[in-house]
Amino acid sequence: MQFFEGCSDGTFEMSEDWLVECILCGQQHRIDRRFLNISIMEQGDVFEHYFWTELTCKGCGGRLFVRTKVYSNKNGDFIREDHECDDVDYIQPPVIRDARRQSCSLTNGSKRITYGINRERFTGGRRMDNLWLLTEERPKPSVVNQIVDMYCKDFDDRITVHNEIKIKPIIVDGIFKFVYKVEGLAVAGAADIFIKTVSGSSSFLDFLLFKQENAPTEGSNEDNLIMAIEETKTSDDESRNTGVYQRGSKFVYITPYYQNVKLYMLYNEELEAREEKKPSDTSVFGTNILLTLGVTIVGKDISRWFRPFRSLDELIRFKAGMRKPPAGNVPITITKYADRIEVSGRLAKPADAGNIGHDPNIGALSMISACIRKLGWDKDIVVTLHGVTQSYVDHTRGKNKFLYICSILGMRLDGIRMPNHVILPELYWHYEKKSEKMADILLHVQTMYHGMYCVYENHAGCERGYFRTKTGRLVTLPKKDRNGVNLYLPDVVLYDEDTNFILLVEGKMLSTLQLGIEEIENYDSIEQEYIYPEYGNVTIIRCVSIFGGNCASIPHEKVLFYLADNGRIIINKNAPQCIRRCFAETGVRI
């Protein structure tokens, strides 16, 4: 390999300064072409000419890496170019010229290289896209890995780096930039993989994957959403309804906002499922509907038991052949008439409440009705035996997720005067800036990045996790303790093996700080029934994480971790050593 400094290696020249932009903060930089690092590597019949530099962003302090690679044959003829950058993109494509025709010289130590310049210009340079994963959930390396595998399979890309996957919060000078970067995993078709926390306006799928240069914009029609994914840990062994039905409405609700996105149901079962066991009729029926709707199933073998419905009559026959619920329950039935199809199912919960609150049936009726439309039915769909009152529907003024689905699919409730104009929320998603989970998820991810591990997580608005024993066994925690009292659970339980510390963290907004202080007094049962029996003589700290406001110091002695609205982080001065270690060299105040 040959090494040079300057703007030319004798074959190619960067004839103009580089203009780049930090994708974390938007700061623009001009890079002097005279001070580039250059190297040449021979790969068989191809020569790779590397032009690169590193710099510190003037805006956020992040370390930026910029590189252009030019390929040539043995004669020095241009083949192609590409650009590989960390946390930075080109504002304008580099201007590359053939450097062999008009005499000129470049000093490389004591070695002088003769080269030339002509007017032949090699353009290139569409800035490389990034992958942006938007989610309401705590980003997990295993799920990111699965999603990237799915992306590569369906979008003709390939993984180029696959080491231990770690998720790093971007913290610069003590300020969290509200973005996470994936390390240890890279693909050929994207410069970087970033994660941002969002919330849905109503019925939101767990993950949205965009492929584009910059972060997606709320409400934009120009963004390139390529995948929408729902994740579930629930197996057919654990629940007859929840895994397949409860999430069904989400695949319908997204359609007015994004018509051409690929949809996925990801079974990420942490508990082992019994693959050889025949799934329940409910599981088969619901999964077949998802397949009919074009949803790709991942993490569950569909080759033996499942297939899409081929006709409306097949859908109706299958449902009619399923086992009926116990007496007193309203069965879900599908009945076809000449001018309508009636689908029965109770939406009220409790049965006499008159509301729309039965989540599994909301999902089931949404899925069934969407499937009926998919199979070609264009007449009325009427939901019967629903238990919903007119006064409840009038009170909602159409602002209800099932009424949104009714509007999307052209459904109506039997005996109910439906709202005249149901207006869907303007945004399908928005960046989260008002949830307590912003602080406790950041604390969770930062500590895991530095070697601590999660014993339990139940972040606000996220799927509830399992209790992890010291041997790695996963346990589903009950709703009650041994005395029949509600089992109070923290938002996250973190363990540091080196110091034998366990942190029980309750996440709250600044406005609900006092409630958090009171709630951590209720953790006796989880400590005595689960933590001490599994982890022995550990040191346990009960504490609160806070998001919101603009405090200049820790707002209460029980607050371990504070995240301000602008991203500024403050750590309690009495924080244990394991927390101090995790935030060392980030500029965070302690």
Regions found by a protein language model. Name each.
Residues 1-17, 35-46, 65-120:
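Short, intrinsically disordered terminal segments enriched in charged and Pro/Gly residues
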Residues 28, 63:
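Cys/His-rich metal-chelating microdomains
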Residues 119-184, 287-289, 318-464, 470:
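Interdomain/boundary linker segments immediately adjacent to catalytic/signaling cores
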Residues 234-279, 487-490, 495-503, 507-565:
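Catalytic cores of nucleic-acid endonucleases
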Residues 265-382, 536-590:
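Domain-level recognition of nuclease-like catalytic cores that cleave nucleotide substrates
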